């Protein structure tokens, strides 16, 4: 019996000893793992401390600018779209004068040499446009009527009374302009080239050739200005129609309507020499509607004749 008890106690003691040994061994292992973890953490902290500033996401002390998106450059306005402000475009009809339309005047209801200016005055309006726009002077269509009577054989008596090409050429040359008379070009590109290379042009149109823009107009002089190659348009002076006057119109529309029944179809003004201007008259003394953008030019007496 005593042996049995001793054996049991010996076994219990052995179990206790083994347990203590195992516990101590496990505790030592856990402490080593914990120490290694702390060492790794310290090493990581040390590594972060040694990272250059450029690699660290440090907060910026500068004020951040807002993101800029790419914007288109502002469009440059075509100067030719504003050049028309200096262009004179006189009107000839009584309806325009009744409404006091810009560039209409008392000449719209005048009777000269037995004819109505409203019937025959388109070419004279164009001549006055050219003289008043391209020189330091200005005149009315009536002034141009008297000048044409003075320097050429023009007379409105009989027929339509409209001034013919040779008389327009003579009158313009007397006022210092270089002028060329042309026939309608067979190719539109040639007409386009001629218009783009001149200061201004007078063109004879007819609705019998093309009635898309003009109707019931067997023959009528119009004035072309400031050809725009980007849009292939011209600034139109149309003395017979206030709705057409001072509008940008496709040059092709003009070409299609050019009359083919006359010896000449259009006139080009290619230059101006003030020394060759034998008139140098300036002043519009008739009642008329001067637009706000059309400033009066200094007056000057005629070198050829007094104003009538």
Regions found by a protein language model. Give the residues of each.
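Extracytoplasmic/periplasmic, Sec-exported soluble proteins
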Residues: 114-123, 136-139, 159-164, 183, ...
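Solvent-exposed loop/turn segments at secondary-structure junctions
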Residues: 129, 136-138, 151-156, 185-188, ...
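Active-site-adjacent structural segments surrounding the nucleophilic cysteine of cysteine proteases
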Residues: 8-11, 19-158, 301-308
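Active-site-adjacent substructure of cysteine-protease-like catalytic cores
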Residues: 183-235
């Amino acid at each position: 019996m005593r042996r049995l008890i001793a054996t049991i106690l010996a076994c219990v003691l052995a179990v206790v000893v083994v347990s203590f040994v195992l516990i101590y061994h496990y505790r030592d292992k856990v402490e080593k793992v914990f120490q290694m973890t702390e060492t790794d953490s310290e090493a990581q902290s040390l590594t972060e401390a040694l990272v250059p500033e450029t690699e660290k996401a440090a907060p910026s002390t500068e004020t951040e600018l807002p993101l800029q998106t790419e914007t288109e450059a502002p469009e440059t306005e075509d100067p030719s779209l504003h050049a028309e402000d200096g262009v004179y475009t006189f009107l000839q009809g009584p309806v325009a004068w009744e409404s006091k339309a810009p560039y209409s005047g008392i000449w719209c209801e005048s009777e000269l040499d037995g004819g109505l200016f409203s019937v025959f005055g388109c070419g004279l309006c164009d001549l006055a446009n050219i003289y008043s726009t391209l020189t330091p002077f200005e005149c009315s269509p009536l002034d141009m009527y008297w000048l044409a009577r003075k320097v050429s054989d023009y007379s409105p008596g009989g027929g339509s009374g409209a001034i013919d090409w040779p008389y327009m050429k003579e009158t313009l040359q007397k006022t210092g302009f270089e002028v060329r008379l042309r026939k309608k070009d067979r190719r539109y590109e040639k007409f386009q080239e001629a218009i783009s290379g001149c200061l201004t042009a007078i063109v004879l149109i007819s609705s019998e050739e093309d009635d898309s823009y003009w109707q019931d107009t067997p023959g009528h002089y119009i004035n072309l200005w400031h050809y725009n190659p980007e849009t292939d348009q011209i600034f139109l002076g149309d003395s017979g129609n206030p709705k057409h006057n001072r509008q940008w119109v496709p040059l092709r529309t003009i070409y299609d309507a050019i009359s083919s029944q006359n010896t000449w179809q259009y006139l080009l003004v290619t230059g101006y020499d003030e020394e060759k201007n034998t008139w140098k008259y300036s002043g519009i003394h008739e009642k008329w509607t001067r637009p706000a953008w059309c400033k009066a030019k200094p007056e000057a007496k005629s070198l050829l004749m007094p104003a009538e």
